[in-house]
């Protein structure tokens, strides 16, 4: 695969037992921890969430921001997200590499997303040159494949890869 438009994002996001464990751990443990870490550094203004998936982290963002835009490549995930978040959140369906935005953002958030992007350099460049407002902040969280919690989950058979 050379370009995002050849990927089937809906197929990639289909639930299986392995992902259900990972998602519930993210929703119940990791998301609140990330919010506690990020929140003191949020700037007033708007926020762009890259890779909103089914809106579970977006719900936390609604506690801090009135102006939220989310980009998600999976149409199935966007549909589910619209069911769980309150009105006022703008969803844009598309791959980060190809989406064009008409404005800049004071806060940009990527939680457990960058590791799924085909070309992270392109996305990070777009964030810096096109999407992040002057003085804006990028909040980024990537999972650690060697973390004890992940290795324990592999040993328990909850996930099959490290």
Language model features: what each stretch is:
Residues 1-103, 107-111, 121-124, 140:
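Conserved N-terminal segment of class I S-adenosyl-L-methionine
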Residues 121-137:
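A short glycine-rich, Lys/Arg-flanked "PGG" loop and its adjoining helix->strand segment in the class I
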Residues 82, 118, 153:
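A short local structural element in Rossmann-fold oxidoreductases
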Residues 112-116:
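Short catalytic micro-motifs in class I SAM-dependent methyltransferases
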Residues 23, 161-162:
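Long, acidic, serine/threonine- and proline-rich low-complexity intrinsically disordered regions
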Residues 47, 132, 153:
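Short glycine- and Lys/Arg-enriched binding-loop motifs that mark or flank ligand-binding interfaces
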Residues 139-161:
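Conserved class I S-adenosyl-L-methionine
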């Amino acid at each position: 695969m050379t370009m995002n438009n050849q990927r089937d994002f809906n197929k990639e996001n289909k639930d299986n037992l392995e992902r259900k464990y990972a998602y519930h751990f993210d929703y119940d443990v990791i998301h609140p921890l990330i919010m506690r870490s990020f929140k003191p550094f949020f700037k007033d203004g708007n926020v762009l969430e890259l890779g909103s998936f089914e809106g579970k982290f977006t719900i936390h963002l609604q506690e801090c921001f009135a102006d939220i835009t989310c980009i998600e490549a999976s149409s199935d995930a966007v549909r589910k997200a619209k069911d769980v978040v309150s009105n006022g959140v703008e969803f844009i369906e598309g791959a980060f590499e190809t989406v064009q935005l008409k404005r800049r953002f004071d806060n940009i958030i990527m939680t457990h997303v960058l590791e799924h992007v085909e070309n992270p350099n392109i996305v990070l460049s777009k964030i810096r040159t096109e999407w992040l407002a002057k003085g804006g902040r990028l909040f980024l969280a990537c999972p650690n494949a060697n973390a004890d919690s992940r290795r324990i989950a592999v040993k328990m058979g909850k996930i099959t890869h490290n």
